[in-house]
Amino acid sequence: MTLQQKELFQKSPLLLENGETLSPVLVGYETYGTLSASRDNCILLEHALTGTAHAAKHFEDDAPGWWDDYIGPGKTIDTDKYFLVCTNVFGGCSGTTGPSSINPKTGEPFRLQFPGFSIKDIIKVQRELLEQLGVTRIVSVIGGSMGGMQATEWAIDYADITDSIINIASPLAAGPDAIGYNLIMRMAILNDPDFNGGNYIGQPEGGLATARMVGMMTYRTSELFSKRFERFTVAESSPAAFSKEHFQIESYLQYQGDTFVERFDANSYLYLTKAIDLFDVTAPAKDDLPAFSKIKIPYLLIGITTDQLFRIHDLRRGYELLKEWDVPVTYHEVASEYGHDAFLVEKEVPKFEPLIRSFLNNLPVKSI
């Protein structure tokens, strides 16, 4: 079964953390496996910033998913055992309501009139979807990068129906360097003349492509770039004297930027990167305790030592904080020349798969 959509919050609007409301909300999602009669074998998979709900192939000739190596019969997320749900995030642009969606009040796209939202709001939409699908309990919420932030919020807001969390390469709060990179990327978009205050036709390609290129530099490592590109050049025809020599790394980054603008919306990029910046579960909640102190379920945290976006010292600090507050946390570190994106790379599956499989297999019996 490929992408499905369900309209939510039709009778009662979605109440966002900032007090704004929205109705209705369309959610795009994909499912794998079958929901059990007891409706308690669900795994919720969270995608990263520019991911989609298409986590794995549904059939042989289907388009590849972003986590094919982990999903399917007999694999880590065994679809003969689990009912897997993956949604496109609220505010995105691949099937779920976001800035490019039509505002029912105006008949025009929301664009920058779309309300601001948080990671907490993203999972609130997911919670409503799972309820509509008949899910009563979740074995685990799994996510990497921004997906790990969503998983952590699930442990805080919906621990009553969630049995465990797997967070890959995501801190308990976005660090200043990640916030800085996100600002640079947003400024590239905002300063593109074609952005037109968010009222663009097509995409502000130059700004969005530049944002993607900046992002790619944080998703990989200098070790990988040196090994792959060194100072190799490629043949390029350019009238500008300063660009007669074109390096392979330049060609690679330009390709990444050019292909990205074909599949992603600039306004969604602005909103989602800001939601990442604002994520901070170390901040005091209403009871003046850090929000993460509410986590009481098994929590697997995997840090990547070479991560250039969410630095390993932030993951280690998160682990120490979780331990201090008696969260049942298990922590592992993975070294990879692929850096932040290592959990998405086929070659690196042997480093992550045993950690995830072991964690799932050793959950309390009630969670299996």
Curated annotation (Swiss-Prot):
The domain of life for this entry's organism is Bacteria
Keyword Cell inner membrane: yes or no? no
Q: Which GO terms describe its cellular component?
A: cytoplasm
What pathway does the annotation place this protein in? Amino-acid biosynthesis; L-methionine biosynthesis via de novo pathway; O-acetyl-L-homoserine from L-homoserine: step 1/1
GO MF annotation terms: homoserine O-acetyltransferase activity
Subunit organization: Homodimer.
Q: What is this protein called?
A: Homoserine O-acetyltransferase
Species of origin reads Listeria innocua serovar 6a (strain ATCC BAA-680 / CLIP 11262)
